Swiss-Prot record:
The protein's name: Proline-rich transmembrane protein 4
Amino acid composition bias (Pro residues), ranges on this chain: 786-798
Signal peptide: 1-18
Membrane-topology annotation of the record: Multi-pass membrane protein
Residues carrying Phosphoserine: 642
Keywords: Membrane, Phosphoprotein, Signal, Transmembrane, Transmembrane helix
Organism: Rattus norvegicus (Rat)
Transmembrane segments: 371-391, 393-413, 431-451, 465-485, 501-521
Gene behind this protein: Prrt4
Tagged with keyword Transferase: no
Stored InterPro entries: PRRT_domain-containing
Protein's cellular compartments: Membrane
Start-end of Polar residues biased regions: 271-301, 703-717
């Protein structure tokens, strides 16, 4: 709709500039508001009137002249000429920035803002400080000389002025003067006695109109309290600067100040008028305006303290009565209702404190202190979560940290103005700071909703995707650019309206998505699958990092905050969207005026934002406080180079001693992954997969036992499984053994971390080469707890309730410094013998055990108590037979080494 309107607008601008036109009269009734959409004839200049389907009207006056050249012209206004339309006076004293963008700037001047829709007299402004302000009124009009001005262009509706017939024409202009009026209305024309509301709302919202309603401090802009409209008196003669409007106009503006202002209510002085920009709220009363330049030395004061000389307006009198000033003011005792509704609740908390306490009582304090305390609580929860994240470091910590930062920003930027602005200390901060304080919380909350959707939707580790990151940067950039542009250049203030609309839409959309995710909780997939089943392809297995809400119970608890945040997010987005529509002329309803609707709307906005921020803060705090599994500390991660931190412990020459013989195919390069040995360190030590070497106490065991050269820890590690060719055979066997039969952490009590690292070595599996001919009867004798041969001492029975039967394939060491391969309890192990290093464990029941750590062989029956050992002897023998058969098949299918040599 907006694009089509702009297209039609440009087309008719071209028609106006290309076609010579003639005059077209229009009739009106003197002394009454304008009741037709056709403006009265203003001069002998030519005029073109086009009445289109939706009542577009364009007026072109003046002979052909050079565009953009300044024109000096004076309009002597006498009581006889005082019946001239206010549109011409408005056109003489206003400049429209939109037309300046269309046809070019006629000179170096600062554009001011036009009147609001339906106001009988617009609050006008002109560049020269010595120019005077016209006094509005349909009956009597004093003479006010107009100073030389630039060529002006206006965009206003025909309903903003009265239309008495002129008795004398103005002098012809020597330059072209273009007046461009647009009125888009539907329905019958209003009657003569009063204005009737259109069937369709006005779409005549130019950039100047919108910018005039955009306060510099947000959607609740630096406007006055609605209490000022409910005074018993109405004071005239207030000065309407670009930053302040004393009385009310007739547009249901979102950023409007309120009606007649009694003197005791304006007690705050603003050092600079530039940070303030207010437009009056609708009323039938007129406004007396005085155009001024942006002068930081001029301060807005009370209505009784107006100085006509300071503003160059001899007619702006503080004590002017309605009769003497010729202003048709509708007072309270006039008995005539206002011409349009007064939506006065789109304002900031800028009422006088004593007056607000008298009007609202406890509700005022609840509004200020209650909402401020809730936003402060949000900031404290976010700060606590940020402090706990480095110590707990749950999965998805970067995403949680970003969520906490956004909530901390939103909470502080909302709590600070509520406490700071209520006492009127706004002049202590620059305008840009206040603009950022008002505009940044909305994109932060919208981005927080997006992160909450990401945390609850992804089953794996949440990572900020490119789309969400771009959306976050776009929202923050648009809000910051709108705030900066509004503080620097006034015509850019409509960007803040676009920013508000975008974030209102995003908040509503993401809130609906969050509600959908909370309802979809029963169908949610499991958060990641455990490792296993295919073996490891690297030297050290990397654990799969899961979502901070991976367990179903944790996800259900976290998802309870989603409906609350989604509901309040929809409420906040709807209210913000209604603000944007109201700024464009929609949504004004009778009965919404007054202090209590204003207070209720403000409180609803604050509660909507708190209802979004507080559940999100609890969502970000839950993984840091209520994580079901204590994760590794982030500080430990900082000192580890990579997940494969144990890889440097497995260099290429991992056997420290001299090998008995060189393995076949040694010229083939081997990676570190192939050097992963099939032994684990038992006990609570580091559980690291260490490289070869001697073991403290193992020499004593070697002295008492006779081991084969193959089973020596310093001998060749591959003598038992050396095939005719080394093509993938070593890796195949290691994968087969590592995937099922390694032990879980914490199965035996072992030395401390420092003691274990001193001399522990890495050993290999028990040599099976000398057992190929052994029958099941021979192998069945090796039962835990029974007297064992010296070379294979039994570790004894595992205590009941130990973690031998639990754990996953991949686990953590006891000091959380490494990864350990764990056994799979639900499958029978495929490797019957796994070598471990047990700690010194003196035991009377097993005198064959050495006094220190020994090289032991664990068999599957050792998982159970000795009572069940006899039942598992046959199973152990069968497993060993299957293992040896698999080794023989591998040897048969392997390629000969002589082929490789060729």
């Amino acid at each position: 709709m907006a694009g089509r309107g702009c297209l039609e607008l440009g087309l008719f601008c071209w028609v106006l500039l290309a076609v010579p036109v003639g005059p077209q009269p229009a009739s009106s009734v003197p002394g009454a508001p304008l009741t037709t959409l056709t403006p009265p004839p203003q001069s002998e200049a030519s005029m073109l009137s086009l009445n289109l389907g939706l009542n577009f009207k364009f007026h072109l006056r003046g002979p052909a002249a050079v565009w953009g050249s300044p024109v000096t012209e004076t309009h002597p206004l006498s009581p006889g000429l005082g019946q001239e339309s206010e549109e011409d006076l408005e056109g003489d004293l206003r400049t429209d920035p939109l037309w300046e963008l269309l046809v070019g700037s006629p000179g170096n001047y600062v554009p001011e803002w036009g009147s609001a829709e339906g106001s009988f007299t617009p609050w006008a402004s002109s560049l020269p400080p010595e120019s005077t302000s016209p006094l509005s009124g349909p009956t009597k009009r004093p003479t006010a000389p107009s100073q030389p001005r630039m060529s002006t262009v206006t965009w206003a509706t025909a309903l903003t002025a009265t239309a008495p017939p002129t008795s004398a024409p103005r002098p012809r202009q020597s330059e072209l003067e273009l007046k461009f009026d647009v009125a888009l209305r539907a329905g019958a024309a209003p009657t003569l006695g009063h204005r009737s509301l259109p069937l369709l709302p006005s779409l005549r919202a130019s950039l100047a109109e919108i910018a005039g309603r955009l306060g510099p401090f947000g959607f609740f802009g630096t406007t006055l309290s609605p209490l000022r409209n409910f005074s018993s008196q109405s004071y005239q003669g207030t000065t309407a600067q670009p930053s302040f409007a004393s009385e009310v106009s007739d547009f249901p503006g979102l950023f409007g100040t309120t009606g007649s202002l009694p003197p005791p209510l304006l007690e705050r002085k603003f050092s600079s008028p530039s940070p303030l920009d207010s437009v009056a709220s609708p009323s039938s009363a007129s406004i007396k305006t005085t155009p001024v330049q942006h002068d930081p030395t001029v301060s807005t004061s009370d209505p009784d303290e107006l100085s006509p000389a300071s503003f160059g307006s001899p007619s702006a009198q503080p004590g002017c009565e309605p009769g003497s000033c010729s202003e048709p003011e509708l007072s309270d005792d006039s008995g005539q209702p206002p011409a349009s509704p007064l939506p006065l609740f789109f304002l900031t908390l800028e009422a006088d404190w004593a007056e607000a306490r008298a009007r609202w009582g406890l509700a005022w304090e609840a509004h200020v202190y209650g909402a401020g305390a809730l936003f402060g609580l949000v900031a404290l929860l976010a700060l606590l979560s940020l402090a706990l994240l480095p110590w707990r470091c749950p999965p998805g910590a970067p995403c949680l940290a970003l969520l906490d930062l956004l909530l901390l920003s939103a909470g502080t930027t909302r709590a600070f103005p509520l406490f700071y602005d209520a006492y009127g200390h706004r002049d202590r901060l620059p305008a840009l700071a206040w603009l950022l304080l008002q505009d940044l919380p909305l994109p932060c909350l919208a981005a927080g909703l997006g992160l909450a959707c990401l945390l609850l939707a992804r089953p794996r580790t949440p990572r900020c995707p490119i789309g969400l990151a771009a959306l976050l940067l776009l929202g923050l950039g648009l809000a910051a650019a709108a705030a900066l542009g509004s503080a620097v250049h006034r015509p850019l203030r409509p960007l803040r309206l676009a920013s508000r609309g975008l974030h209102a839409f995003l908040a509503a959309f993401l809130s609906g998505l969050l509600l959908a995710l909370s309802c979809w909780g029963g169908r949610r997939r499991r958060a990641g699958a455990p490792l296993g089943g295919s073996g490891f392809k690297g030297a050290t297995p990397v654990p799969q990092v899961r979502s901070p809400f991976a367990p179903r119970e944790s996800w259900r608890r976290a998802a309870r905050t989603a409906p609350v945040a989604g509901t309040f997010g929809l409420l906040s987005g709807a209210l913000q969207g209604y603000e944007v529509l109201h700024a464009l002329g929609y949504g004004g309803q009778t009965g919404l005026e007054g202090p209590w609707p204003w207070w209720a709307f403000q409180l609803g906005l604050r509660l909507g934002e708190v209802g979004v921020a507080l559940p999100l803060a609890l969502l970000g705090l839950y993984p840091a406080l209520c994580s079901p599994r204590v994760p590794r500390r982030c500080w430990a991660k900082l000192f580890r180079l990579s997940p494969g931190h144990a890889a440097p412990l497995l260099p290429g020459g991992w056997v420290p001693g001299i090998r008995d013989k060189e393995p076949l195919g040694s010229a083939i390069a081997r990676g570190d992954a192939e050097l992963l040995q099939l032994c684990a360190l038992a006990g609570p030590g580091p559980d690291l997969l260490l490289q070869g070497g001697s073991c403290p106490g193992f020499e004593g065991a070697r002295a008492n036992t006779t081991q084969s050269p193959a089973s020596s820890p310093s001998s060749d590690c591959t003598v038992d499984f050396r095939p005719p060719s080394p093509i993938n055979l070593r890796r195949s066997i290691e994968e087969a053994l590592c995937s099922e039969a390694l032990l879980a952490p914490g199965l035996f009590q072992g030395p401390a971390f420092g003691d274990a690292l001193s001399g522990l070595g890495l050993y290999r599996t028990i040599s099976l080469g000398n057992k190929t001919g052994a029958g099941p009867s021979e192998k069945s004798e090796k039962v835990p707890g029974s007297p064992a041969p010296p070379e294979l001492p039994s570790p004894g029975a595992w205590p009941p309730g130990s973690s031998a039967s639990s754990g996953s394939l991949c686990g953590l060491s006891r000091d959380s410094s490494s990864m350990l391969l764990c056994s799979s309890p639900d499958r029978p192990p495929r490797c019957p013998l796994v070598c471990v290093l047990s700690p010194p464990r003196p035991s009377e029941s097993s005198p064959s055990l050495p006094a220190s750590g020994s090289y032991q062989a664990l068999s599957p029956p050792s998982r159970d108590s000795p009572e069940h050992a006899s039942e598992l002897q046959a199973e152990e023998a069968l497993l060993q037979e299957q293992f040896l058969d698999a080794c023989r098949q591998i040897d048969e299918l392997s390629m000969g080494s002589d082929t490789i040599d060729l």
